[in-house]
Amino acid sequence: MSTPSAAPALLEVDDLTVRFGGLTAIEALSFRVHEKQIAALIGPNGAGKTTAFNAISRLVKPASGRIRMRGVDLLQRRASQISALGLTRTFQNLALWPGLTVLENVMVGAHHRGHQGFASATVRWGTAREERALREESFELLSRFGIADVAFQPCEGLPYGTLKRVELARALAGRPQLLMLDEPAAGLNHGEVVKLGELIMLVRQTTDVSVLLIEHHMRLVMSISDWVIALASGRKLVEGSPAEVQKDARLIEAYLGGADSHAAS
């Protein structure tokens, strides 16, 4: 079995347990995400992947365990403070503002770096100098992702694959240290999935951002990930390099043997 990256750990999850009433959704989960690493959480439906994401981003309260980012205890912080610590998360469903232009949506993504709150950021950006800097930086992100041609169009009515790229650009506009992507390939066709993989690799190659993703598209996961953590029924089955994990008998059994009956997702 391969050893994890020698780079420092950015995110440390230790003995994480999450319960909903009498149901244990995650039990004693531990893993690391290292600097400039692409890590993936995989597993059948009900494995606990999204619950783990929700715990890390402080949307659900764990029963026990510890979550640290660069040594900072995230469980001692409110959900509203998480982005300022360098953690940005996308969701399975798009969360763009349809009435704003593509460029404005990306500019909103950088709101926590300034002095404006999220709501006010959609109305006024601060000083003219701040707005100009945000606009230039956001347009550069759109250019990098190949969608600068729609920068001044409203998001409403744009193709779904384009909106996925807008969402990724907006997440990066906040200059995160850790980017958490929740099923980024959902709803994309084959060509769009290939492009998405190229964009995620581009992020790793051109920035210091680490990526943690949940994804069911195994070809994408195995082609871009440095490290894979496989879950089933709220527990960690195996972790390792993509080559090691995809041939592990425990993971094969989890997908084919009905280990997706657990209620977490």
What does each model-found stretch correspond to?
Residues 2-265:
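Glycine-rich phosphate-binding loops of nucleotide-dependent enzymes
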